[in-house]
Structure formats: C-alpha cells, structure tokens
C-alpha cells in the first residue's frame, strides 16, 4: 500500500518544493522513498519524540522534533503536501488546521478503513487501483 502512496505523491506533487510527514514514528521508509522519487523536493519528517528523531540516519530526509498540536509554523511554510500515516484520531483536527494555515494539501492514511469522522464535504477518498489508500483534503489535486 505505501508503494502506491509514494507513486501517487510522485505523480501529483512532482513539482513540490516541500513535502512533510507528521508523526513519522519508527517508519521512515515512506519519506525516504518519496525523497528518492522526487530528488528536487525537500522531504521533512516530524515527531514529538525527540530521542526518536535524533536517532535517525536518513540521508536527504530532514527529521525535526515538533508537535502538530502546537506547531512551529516556519517549519511547514512552503509545503505543498502534509501527510500522516496511521495518525491517532485526536491529532487529525490539528493536522487539518495546520494544512489550512499554510495552504497545503493534507493526506491522512488511517489504519484500515477508519475515517476519524472526517466531514465528507471537505474530505475525499484517495482511491488508487480500486483501493482506498487514505483521505485527502486538498487545494491542488
């Protein structure tokens, strides 16, 4: 599934200056794949766990400690896409608020088919090859 997300991001954000993953946790491989697929794009990952962020040997991907509930806005400025893989439901509203503030699209990839009560008038399913990969709040795509 994550390979399909990387391919979709490559196809739809090939001209992006910056793409950000929020709540990277232990899974850095998706950001690394995006960085390889889009070598001219800055790929940034954030997490609230400072020791986890400091432990990253991640090549071109930059890792920063930040909390989406109280974001450091200048980190996110210029991003075309913010995405989060399997975020806890309680941060989805903060993700949406941040994306709206900086004018970025937001992709939320929940665990299985969970929707976190996303308002249908603003969010749409991201379907690739007949499979729902996530939920998109977008300005561009």
Named regions from a protein language model:
Residues 70-77:
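Short conserved loop adjoining the S-adenosyl-L-methionine
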Residues 103-117:
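Conserved beta-strand signature within the Rossmann-like core of class I S-adenosyl-L-methionine
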């Amino acid at each position: 599934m994550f390979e399909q997300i990387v391919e979709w991001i490559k196809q739809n954000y090939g001209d992006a200056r910056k793409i950000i993953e929020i709540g990277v946790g232990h899974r850095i491989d998706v950001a690394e794949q995006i960085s390889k697929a889009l070598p001219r794009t800055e790929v940034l990952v954030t997490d609230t766990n400072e020791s986890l962020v400091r432990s990253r040997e991640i090549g071109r991907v930059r890792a920063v400690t930040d909390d989406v509930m109280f974001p450091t806005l200048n980190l996110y400025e210029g991003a075309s896409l913010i995405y989060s893989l399997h975020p806890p439901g309680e941060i989805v509203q903060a993700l949406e608020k941040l994306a709206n503030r900086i004018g970025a699209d937001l992709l939320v990839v929940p665990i299985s088919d969970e929707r976190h009560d996303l308002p249908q008038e603003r969010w749409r399913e991201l379907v690739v090859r007949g499979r729902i990969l996530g939920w998109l709040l977008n300005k561009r795509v």
